From Swiss-Prot:
Compartmental location: Cytoplasm
Domain CoA carboxyltransferase C-terminal: 39-293
GO molecular function list: acetyl-CoA carboxylase activity; ATP binding; carboxyl- or carbamoyltransferase activity
Name used for this protein in its record: Acetyl-coenzyme A carboxylase carboxyl transferase subunit alpha
Membership in a protein family: Belongs to the AccA family.
GO cellular component: acetyl-CoA carboxylase complex
Pfam family for this entry, one: ACCA
GO terms for biological process, alphabetical: fatty acid biosynthetic process; malonyl-CoA biosynthetic process
Entry-linked NCBIfam families: accA, AccA_sub, PRK05724.1
Originating species: Stutzerimonas stutzeri (strain A1501)
InterPro entries recorded: Acetyl_CoA_COase_a_su, ClpP/crotonase-like_dom_sf, COA_CT_C
Enzymatic class: transferase
Pathway participation: Lipid metabolism; malonyl-CoA biosynthesis; malonyl-CoA from acetyl-CoA: step 1/1
Length: 316
């Protein structure tokens, strides 16, 4: 099966394969088969709309992990200019699972911070598959405090299975690093906008997710545990992950209904990985609009709004 497609997209993959075959035949024999190709393309688009209009929570969770889905550095390249990556937590080391630095969004200085999973095997290992260690969160905290000092808005991009649970991370106090970030972000005197672009896994996501405005891409997820992890606890088997995903309410629309998410940003047909440029354009529009709104608030109003937002979690 084409690696671009997940199993529930197989009918789309089959149609795309037929279209490619016809294009090759046309190129080889100079045949005019444009009408047939156009018909199949229309059929493929209609089929895609049908499949993506009825996705289950588990299918959305799998889309959120798609290996070709744009990562933080992809969006940085599309959205920002003058990005200058900053490294290190000034305590232990640099963690490549968190990237961050100064940049400009349509000319406006901002601090950008996000998880980075990696594409190829070596990069995935170097970035620990997007699972930060304490030094990653401490680096993020250092950059956020720098942003406050220079009166720069903070934009975070969330995409992680969770914080790294290894022994070395626990030895360096993983839970303290996450908790400290929550404390600091709740008090920062600068606007914070967080966007879930893929997986939002537990405290590893929340550690850069305390904000004034929370966005989720249409096919992203946000939860305290993975569907497989939940299923393994409740049903003693990861095979119940589809049921767990539905029960947990991990999708953007469900979380919007609960009042946790402020804005669901629609994705291109087939997901963000089908057209990253279009996805980035939609994100740019939202980020600019939200920054304009938040910058109109004075510091006291900004912090009061953030506090009220945090305290409203869990209230029906």
């Amino acid at each position: 099966m084409n690696p671009n497609f997940l199993d529930f997209e197989q009918p789309i993959a089959d149609l795309q394969a037929k279209i490619e075959e016809l294009r090759l035949v046309g190129n080889d024999n100079s045949l005019n088969i444009g009408d047939e190709i156009a018909r199949l393309q229309d059929k493929s688009e209609s089929l895609t709309e049908g499949i993506f209009g009825n996705l289950t929570s588990w299918q959305i969770a799998r889309l959120a992990r798609h290996p070709q889905r744009p990562y933080t550095l992809d969006y940085i390249n599309h959205l920002f200019t003058e990005f200058e990556e900053l490294h290190g937590d000034r305590h232990f080391s640099d963690d490549a699972a968190i990237v961050g630095g100064t940049a400009r969004l349509d000319g406006q200085p901002v601090m950008v911070i996000g998880h980075q999973k990696g594409r190829e095997v070596r990069e995935k290992v170097r970035r620990n598959f997007g699972m930060p260690r304490p030094e990653g969160y401490r680096k993020a905290c250092r950059l956020m405090e720098m942003a406050e000092r220079f009166k720069m808005p903070i934009l975070t991009f969330i995409d992680t299975p969770g914080a790294y649970p290894g022994i070395d991370a626990e030895e360096r106090n993983q839970s303290e690093a996450i908790a400290w970030n929550l404390r600091v972000m709740a008090r920062l005197k600068t606007p914070i906008i967080a966007t879930v672009i893929g997986e939002g896994g537990s405290g590893g996501a929340l550690a850069i997710g305390v904000c004034d405005q929370l966005n989720m891409l249409q096919y992203s997820t946000y939860a305290v545990i993975s569907p497989e992890g939940c299923a393994s606890i409740l049903w003693r088997t990861a095979e119940k992950a589809p049921e767990a995903a539905e029960a947990m309410g991990v999708t953007a629309e469900r979380l919007k209904d609960l009042g946790i998410v402020d804005k669901v940003i629609p994705e291109p047909l087939g997901g963000a990985h089908r057209n990253p440029a279009v996805m980035a354009a939609a994100m740019r529009e939202q980020l600019n609009s939200q920054l304009h709104m938040l910058k109109s608030l004075d510091t006291d109003a900004l912090l009061a709004r953030r506090y009220e937002r945090l305290m409203s979690y869990g209230i029906a």
